[in-house]
Amino acid sequence: MKPLLSLDRVSVSRDGRNVLDKLSLSLAAGERLALIGDNGVGKTTLLRTIVGLEPASGEITAFGINCRNESDFRKIRAKAAYLFQNPDDQLFCPTVIDDVAFGPLNLGLSRQEAMELSNGLLHDLGLGHLAGRITHHLSGGEKRLVSLAAVLAMQPQVLLLDEPTNALDEKHLERMLAILSAQKIAMIIVSHDWEILERLTDRAVVLRNGKLLPAMLHRHSQWSEQVHLHYVEAEGSAL
């Protein structure tokens, strides 16, 4: 079966250095991939590159489309939803329901269809009480959950999540984890919280010096409950 997403020898240069250096990656349907790395190593750049928000060399193929121009990437962004690290970068409409309905409207649904879908989704996610709220009056945790609802409203095949649980209190963290755990779609999740990645993902890679290294998140419960990282041998050149 062909992967949903495939990057082949993709490079992104910035200030004279390769942030991504002939990097290859594939993501299968339903697969949940943890993307790990130090601050500033290029994890966000990689997510942005997948949806065409960074100029890159190499080959990016997604959903059967060999992406060569902005027209191709617009089709990709309808199926690969990117959750920004800062929810204020994602939410710009007056009310929550308007923010959630924005994506479906942009995909061609009528206003009635978009509102019905968005209200139903908010209800299903346990966020129905927020529908009429003014977005900029929400707490940080509420904004993060609403931004997730906004990308899910586009009914994507892949979620690209940039630090989705960062700075959430316990209540909003558990709500976020419950929502993500219930999704039956592929994901790439960037996070510094290995405990959360171990709960949500089934494969891990580490971005270092522009390359991806295969890894495994693991815990030895008989010695320690703390999750730690093992590097593993790759079975071929593509991850």
Swiss-Prot record:
UniProt keywords, alphabetically: ATP-binding, Cell inner membrane, Cell membrane, Membrane, Nucleotide-binding, Translocase, Transport
Disulfide bond recorded as keyword: no
Class in the EC hierarchy, top level: translocase
Residue stretches making up the ABC transporter domain: 5-234
Membrane topology classification: Peripheral membrane protein
Binding of ATP, residues: 37-44
Enzyme Commission numbers on file: 7.-.-.-
Compartment list: Cell inner membrane
Record flagged with keyword Membrane: yes
SUPFAM superfamilies linked: P-loop containing nucleoside triphosphate hydrolases
GO molecular function, one term: ATP binding
UniProt-listed InterPro entries: AAA+_ATPase, ABC_transporter-like_ATP-bd, ABC_transporter-like_CS, ABC_transpr_CbiO/EcfA_su, ECF_ABC_transporter_ATP-bd, P-loop_NTPase
Pfam family, one: ABC_tran
Gene3D superfamilies associated with the record: P-loop containing nucleotide triphosphate hydrolases
Annotated Gene Ontology cellular component terms: ATP-binding cassette (ABC) transporter complex
Major site of localization recorded for this protein: membrane
Known role: Probably part of an ABC transporter complex. Responsible for energy coupling to the transport system.
Family under the similarity heading: Belongs to the ABC transporter superfamily.
UniProt protein name: Putative ABC transporter ATP-binding protein BR1368/BS1330_I1363
Lineage, uppermost ranks: Bacteria, Pseudomonadati, Pseudomonadota, Alphaproteobacteria, Hyphomicrobiales
